[in-house]
From Swiss-Prot:
Catalytic activity, reaction form: (R)-4'-phosphopantetheine + ATP + H(+) = 3'-dephospho-CoA + diphosphate
Name assigned to this protein: Phosphopantetheine adenylyltransferase
Single annotated GO MF: ATP binding
Record text on subunit structure and interactions: Homohexamer.
Classification via InterPro entries: Cyt_trans-like, PPAT, Rossmann-like_a/b/a_fold
Sequence positions that bind ATP: T10, F11, H18, G89, L90, R91, E99, N124, S125, F126, I127, S128, S129, T130
Record Gene3D superfamilies: HUPs
GO biological process, any: coenzyme A biosynthetic process
Amino acid sequence: MHKRAIYPGTFDPVTNGHADLIERAANLFEHVIIGIAANPSKQPRFTLAERVELLKTVTAHLDNVEVVGFSGLLVDFAKEQNASVLVRGLRAVSDFEYEFQLANMNRRLSPDLESVFLTPAEENSFISSTLVKEVALHGGDVSQFVHAEVANALTKKAN
């Protein structure tokens, strides 16, 4: 089965939870595109170019994973990338309602685009980019939550 999947997100920064889901998706699909949303309304700490580079570092060992920045509608990006599946992560029940609404909107806009939900490993289920940034901002050690390169980048941003 030839399936191209997109795992979209802001990834500001990419966490071990994201990396876990990327590995799971890479085992399920022939080709996985990490679609990094420009998303200026979220006021990301890292630029789009920085987020792309960090994701490339984190996924360098995965031959079937590609990292691409994008802006605009996700369904349009999926069509440009010839992807038929969107991969989304669910950490807790609280994520489900938003993801359910998003999946239905995407299906309405692009009926052939299917959403697949993956859950992270238990040890990553509480990690969020927001929490990681908050810990780093206050000088805390985030090395157990992110790749070493990401931890270094966060330290540089905090100083």
